[in-house]
């Protein structure tokens, strides 16, 4: 028989007391029959590898939905289409996409947990309007961390207006955003501020355990730059996020000096315009990435890179295969 049903219709808890009653009836049906429910307010599921497109989202009428290793779970049905178009533009493919809706039965955590042992999935992207079924989400996130599969989330509700919209959309309980932020951080879930960042942060997250996922997680960051002003902006933003820039150790400074690279004992390695030469930036990156006191390196390039990207961007790209990000 049928084991799972998807409910596209809205008009449940988000619509008031009568809708909440209808939602409770759905829960009772699920409990008494063993039927699992995806939704309400779900636009369905997509499995690119198998060619399954079970969704009312018109974005999937587009041919060649990219297949890959990222699994998406979203409270918003329209956002799975938006994420596919953005991922496609960045060369990101998907192992599956699920529009979860109001989570009357099946939740984000339970759905994602069911895929944890799929070798074709390397990480997760979540679009969250609220935090429901916290125990299931917590259990999933911890198991994902143990398997080295990063979880990246974009969660609405930072402002009171956005929280109100989320509540009227899927009946979500808004709650205090700082509590949600602490909850996600404690699970090692990386919360991003911009939608595009969901995919941009993914390669970094795969290389470095996220905070909260492991007690051995390293956050010692070195900054190398061709522009002092740009580096100061980066250091400022890192500081706002509780990340301290690591000064380069004396032994590493000595190695840089031997390689003919100027350096000082400050928190930023400023190569000045000399860093626009490939061999200077590449050698500096090699030495910093090998330094035991550093877990990751942020390279900051100036405006010269816009017109001659090979000067400063190419050595960064050529360092991407290093074990450290």
Annotated model-derived regions:
Residues 1-325:
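Catalytic-core regions of core metabolic enzymes
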């Amino acid at each position: 028989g049928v084991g799972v049903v998807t409910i596209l219709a809205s008009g449940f808890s988000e619509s008031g007391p009568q809708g909440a009653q209808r939602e409770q009836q759905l829960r009772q049906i699920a409990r008494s029959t063993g039927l699992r429910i995806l939704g309400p307010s779900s636009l369905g599921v997509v499995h690119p590898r198998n060619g399954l497109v079970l969704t009312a989202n018109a974005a999937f009428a587009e041919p060649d939905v990219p297949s890959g290793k990222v699994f998406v779970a979203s409270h918003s049905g329209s956002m799975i289409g938006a994420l596919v178009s953005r991922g496609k533009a960045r060369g990101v493919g998907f192992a599956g996409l699920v529009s979860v809706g109001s989570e009357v039965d099946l939740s984000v955590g339970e759905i994602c947990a069911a895929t944890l042992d799929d070798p074709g999935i390397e990480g997760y992207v979540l679009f969250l309007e609220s935090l429901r079924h916290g125990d299931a989400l917590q259990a999933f996130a911890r198991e994902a961390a143990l398997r080295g599969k990063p979880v990246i989330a974009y969660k609405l509700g930072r402002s009171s207006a956005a929280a109100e919209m989320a509540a009227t959309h899927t009946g979500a309980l808004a709650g205090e955003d700082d509590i949600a932020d602490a909850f996600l951080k404690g699970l090692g879930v990386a919360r991003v501020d911009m939608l595009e960042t969901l995919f941009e942060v993914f390669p970094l997250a795969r290389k470095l355990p996220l905070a909260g996922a492991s007690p051995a997680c390293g956050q010692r960051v070195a900054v190398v730059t061709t522009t002092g002003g740009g580096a100061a902006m980066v250091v400022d933003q890192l500081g706002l996020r509780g990340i301290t820039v690591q000064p380069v150790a004396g032994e590493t400074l000595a190695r840089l000096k031997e390689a003919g690279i100027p350096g000082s004992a400050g928190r930023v390695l400023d190569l000045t315009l000399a860093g626009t030469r490939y061999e200077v930036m590449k050698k500096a990156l090699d030495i910093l990435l090998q330094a035991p006191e550093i877990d990751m390196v942020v390279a900051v390039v100036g405006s010269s890179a816009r017109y001659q990207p090979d000067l400063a961007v190419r050595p960064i790209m050529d360092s991407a295969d290093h074990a450290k990000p």
